[in-house]
Structures are given as C-alpha cells and as structure tokens.
Regions:
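Glycine-rich, basic loop-to-helix element that forms the pyrophosphate-binding segment
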Residues: 74-91
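Short aromatic/hydrophobic "clamp" motif used to bind/position activated sugar donors
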Residues: 96
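Active-site-adjacent helix/loop segment of glycosyltransferases
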Residues: 216-303, 307
Length: 353
C-alpha cells in the first residue's frame, strides 16, 4: 500500500461577466471537466449579468444537479475580486483554483498544481500561462518581458517549480484555509469587466497571506499550463500603453496596503535586470537585421515610463486621499469580505519604483 497522501480536492472558480465570451466560457469549463485529476466541482460566478446567469443555469442544469458545476451570482460589488470571493465562500474543496473565463487548461493542470501541496507549508501554487494570439502569432513588436500585459507568464520568471512572492491570478490555487487566515481578495482593486484594466489584486493578497501565515510558501510550477486567449484589440499598442499605465496605478495601491518594501520587491529586480536585458536583445536584433528588435526595445522603454508615471500619480493620489478605497476581511457565507480598510502605511525609504 502506498504511503503517498491523497491529492487535495479542488474547487475550480471561473468568474464570468459577458455573453460575448460564451464560447470561451464553455471551452474553459470543458477543459476543467476533462482534467486527469478530476475536480470536486466547478463554480461559475456571474458578475451582475442576469441574462448570462440564466443562460448558464440552463446550460449546466444537469451538471448542477450532480454538483459537478454550480452557477452563482456575484454576491458582492461588481468586479473580479468580489466574484472570486463569492466562489471562495461557496467552495467545498480543500484547495480553490482560479481559471480565467477566456482560458483553456491543459489535461494535467490540476495534477501539477496538486503536487505542490504535498508540503504542508505551501499555501498557494500557480502555473504557466501561455498566450493564444488572435492573429495566430505574437505581434513582432510585443516583448515577452511584458506578457503580463495580456495576463500571461512573462520572460524573467524562473523556470520549474520555484518559490515566488505571488502567483498570477488567472492560473492560481490557494488552500481554502489560507483565506481564513488572510481574508479574501481586496475589493476596490482589480478588474471590473473591460472597463478598468487594473490588476495586482492577487499580488496584494499573496503578500498579505505571507504576513498572516508564518513560514508560508507560495510556488509556481511551470508544468501547470493554461492557454489564455488574447483578442485582437489587446494585440495593439494602444492597449499595451493603457494596461502598463494602469499597472503603475495598481502597484501604488498595493504599496499603500502592504508597504513599498514588499509591494515592489519583485519589481525592482524586474526593472533593474530583466528589462535592461530585453532592451539590449532588441538592439542586438536590430543590428543583426532581425524584424521587430527596435519595436520591442522601444516598447520596453515606453512601458517602463508609463508604469512609472502611473505609480507616481497613484502614490500622489493616495497621499492626498484620492485613491480608490479598497478593503478585505474574512469571507462570509455570502461571499462578501467584512469591511477592513487598508491600513495607512508610514513612508519608507527606498520606495522608488
């Protein structure tokens, strides 16, 4: 008889908000239901869209009766964070995994996520997210170092199964007990459909979780692969500019919550090592006559400038009390965190982006 512990039971949460992604939603659910390690349940959380809620309820009527797929309405304010909190509150599994509604998981996705939890110190495991470009190929100017702009794993992250500060939200999992210790995703930060391309809600949560659980370990395992669709509009430089600027605003909110030391720890290495190397590669490719080198180098420089500008403005707003209010707290049965305002952080030295 094997002494190997049984894998954890997974609740997979997919937050949805628009019928325009109907085919993508069905594909995402299908990829979860075909996993080599079957999940306990798939939870579809609908973000304040009654028509989509009714349509999904009808589509998965049979699966709902068996408990394999459940369709829920977001019980909190509009936005991705509250939707995730609704899913967490309803989850019955030992581990809660999150998959984007426009992504497809590979067959062994949950199997590889589960492998990380053999260590009881591990509280979160993320995976590798590959872009599926609408045009069929990466835009020649688009640097791999900025794949986070389209919700994907970017160049500069270490390979293999490695310890990290934070996982990436569209391909992530957490022990259910982690939310009891640290609370849920902060509302007031993160995405609200397509209207607000902010992010960093998972970064803020992961730092808060590490502070709440002594010795907590967070991992990324690059064998846990999903494929994330990148629509044509997000292949354009206009979206790139908007998204990197919004990331700067988001980082300012994270620094306000957890302090600039932890909030910008990984970003300092990224901007001082990864991005300069990317610029040099772009220049080299240009000199060698390879297509797109100058564009990639220029995009990196532009991205740094815009993100820094967003961070500076977000920091100024926070000091003046004009930044968006966000809060977190214990997950209630309704899926809404009890209001806990982000604490004021003393100004720290060395907080430059």
């Amino acid at each position: 008889m094997s002494d190997r512990p049984a894998p954890p039971r997974f609740s997979v949460v997919i937050c949805v908000y628009t019928e325009e992604r109907w085919g993508d939603i069905l594909a995402a659910v299908d990829s979860v239901r075909k996993q080599s390690l079957a999940p306990l349940e798939t939870l579809l959380v609908v973000d304040h869209n009654e028509r989509l809620l009714d349509r999904l309820t009808e589509e998965f009527a049979d699966a709902r009766r068996t408990g394999e797929v459940r369709v829920l309405a977001n019980a909190g304010p509009r936005g991705l964070s509250a939707g995730r909190n609704t899913g967490i509150a309803a989850a019955r599994g030992d581990v809660v995994a999150f998959l984007d509604d426009d992504a497809v998981a590979e067959h062994d996705w949950l199997h590889h996520l589960a492998a990380g939890y053999t260590d009881p110190a591990v509280v979160a495991v993320g995976g590798r997210t590959l872009p599926a470009w609408a045009s069929g190929r990466r835009p020649v100017w688009f640097p791999e170092e900025f794949d986070w702009v389209v919700g994907c794993t970017y160049r500069g992250l270490p390979p293999g199964r490695v310890r990290v500060r934070n996982v990436l939200g569209g391909n992530a999992s957490f022990r259910r007990s982690a939310f009891d210790a640290a609370g849920g995703f902060a509302t007031g930060i993160g995405r609200d459909g397509d209207r607000r391309p902010l992010g960093c809600e998972e970064t803020e949560l992961c730092i808060r979780l590490a502070n709440a659980v002594p010795g907590a370990v967070l991992l990324i395992d690059d064998r846990a692969v999903i494929h994330h669709k990148v629509p044509a509009v997000r292949e354009r430089f206009a979206y790139f500019r908007t998204r990197v600027y919004a990331e700067g605003l988001s980082k300012a909110l994270v620094a306000q919550s957890v302090g600039a030391g932890k909030g910008l720890e990984s970003e300092r290495r990224y901007t001082s090592r990864v991005l300069p190397a990317g610029v040099l590669r772009g220049v080299r490719d240009t000199l060698l006559g390879r297509p797109g080198g100058a564009g990639r180098a220029g995009a990196i420089v532009t991205g740094v400038a815009l993100a820094a500008g967003g961070y500076a403005l977000g920091t100024l707003r926070a000091r003046r009390g004009g930044s968006p209010a966000f809060s977190w707290g214990p997950i209630t049965p309704e899926g809404v965190p009890q209001e806990t305002a982000a604490p004021e952080q003393p100004e720290k030295k060395g907080a430059a982006a």
